[in-house]
């Protein structure tokens, strides 16, 4: 039977320390509830002595969290321990997490003590914490740079004093997986009473090895891993729990371990943390990045179409991923991907010439970069429109905004070679006003689904790049605009979309003609 690995989440404590602004009470509640749904065993919710606000947050969460064990951090100081316990008084199931520097550097330069004094402080603190709870975790801060002999001594002492979990942090992300595994192995071989406590690890990512170090520690016998969702944390962050969890899941048979995590909640939890912490998830972020389950190479796309397992070791649906794009159409895509997208749109092989379509597809992909389904349709059934000028052109626009938030937009839109349409609308904000005016001008009933703004370059002359996705007749269309003025970039993006919609309509007309 596989042994259970305890998952200890410190997103609300160590993760929050990395944020530019503190989380609000409601944001902390939403993240805590998401972590509970995920099935995290222990949630470290704060450092109560650090501020009155943190104390109140811990107190609030101690009333809300029911299924996971709640935990608070405390230095090995009497006042810290009392305040930590007081903050969690409303919880029936809490842990006090004590920490104290143990490396020569921390002992001498930070704490200004000798190691015997460190052991005395640690033992006294564990004994004090036992007055409030039987669940006590002790962390040897900077264990990765602590001499093994000192680790043996302090771990044996705190376990004897009543610590139920002993944490071995690689506080500055210094060790390699081989080195860290050796440290853990040596502890199990030399600390006499080590089996009387759960041994835990808390790895930082300064050298990019936090997850690898955590897994190597499991191989050595560790039964608790600490980390944060999305790898949040000071400096380079902590071990990313979603990566730890899925590594344990994928290799559960060889590692002979398991967790109580509901992996179906991983994607949702990650998005909640990303949203509230204002930390975008990189496209290529392991497990949760949008590119993880997307394929652009023609060879890979062909392999995925035959069997997803050829190039995917995780089923995206198993972790709650629903909004991923499986096959990106680029100049690297092969015929199999083009054929797959046409079939997905409902077209049979007999409806078009695949070889001709693929030749035209490559030409357009070299110019445009990424190709969408409506581009394929246009190439297959109305190829000539790809070489025509844009039907809609924005001749002029002006936006007047008021402090009330209302903005009035006036636009002049050229339609085809002759028609000029002039429209004015008042709406909430300048971008919405522009979009509503363009909507009225074209009579397209479209819904803005996504708006993304990013800077291309630095300083005041940087270009604003706007990417949008709109829905028209249950179909998504993509648009891009680039300008030093973000309102102009937004307008260009919408006009870009309007042209795609117009071209799509011409394709439909051509299909109707061919069917007659």
UniProtKB/Swiss-Prot annotation:
Role summary? Catalyzes the condensation of the acetyl group of acetyl-CoA with 3-methyl-2-oxobutanoate (2-ketoisovalerate) to form 3-carboxy-3-hydroxy-4-methylpentanoate (2-isopropylmalate).
Q: Name one GO cellular component term.
A: cytosol
Entry's EC annotation: 2.3.3.13
Task: Tell me which Gene Ontology terms the entry assigns under biological process.
Answer: L-leucine biosynthetic process
Quote the SUPFAM superfamilies the UniProt record gives: 2-isopropylmalate synthase LeuA, allosteric (dimerisation) domain (SSF110921), Aldolase (SSF51569)
MF terms in GO: 2-isopropylmalate synthase activity; acetyl-CoA C-acetyltransferase activity; manganese ion binding
- Family annotation (PANTHER family): 2-ISOPROPYLMALATE SYNTHASE 1, CHLOROPLASTIC-RELATED, HOMOCITRATE SYNTHASE-RELATED
- Similarity annotation: Belongs to the alpha-IPM synthase/homocitrate synthase family. LeuA type 1 subfamily.
Q: Which InterPro entries match?
A: 2-IPM_HCS-like, 2-isopropylmalate_synth_dimer, AIPM/Hcit_synth_CS, Aldolase_TIM, LeuA/HCS_post-cat, LeuA_allosteric_dom_sf, LeuA_bact_synth, PYR_CT
Which residue stretches belong to region Regulatory domain?
Answer: 393-516
- Reaction(s) catalysed (UniProt annotation): 3-methyl-2-oxobutanoate + acetyl-CoA + H2O = (2S)-2-isopropylmalate + CoA + H(+)
Q: Which UniProt keywords apply?
A: Amino-acid biosynthesis, Branched-chain amino acid biosynthesis, Cytoplasm, Leucine biosynthesis, Manganese, Metal-binding, Plasmid, Transferase
Is Amino-acid biosynthesis tagged as a keyword? yes
Q: Where is the Pyruvate carboxyltransferase domain?
A: 5-267
Q: Where is the protein situated, by its record's location annotation?
A: Cytoplasm
Q: Which pathway does the protein contribute to? A: Amino-acid biosynthesis; L-leucine biosynthesis; L-leucine from 3-methyl-2-oxobutanoate: step 1/4
One matching Pfam family: LeuA_dimer
CDD domains the UniProt entry points to? DRE_TIM_IPMS
Q: Which Gene3D superfamilies does its entry note?
A: 1.10.238.260, 3.30.160.270, Aldolase class I (3.20.20.70)
Required cofactors, per record? Answer: Mn(2+)
Keyword Ribonucleoprotein assigned to the entry: answer is no
Q: Fill in the subunit field for this protein.
A: Homodimer.
State the species of origin: Buchnera aphidicola subsp. Cinara cedri (strain Cc)
The protein, known as: 2-isopropylmalate synthase
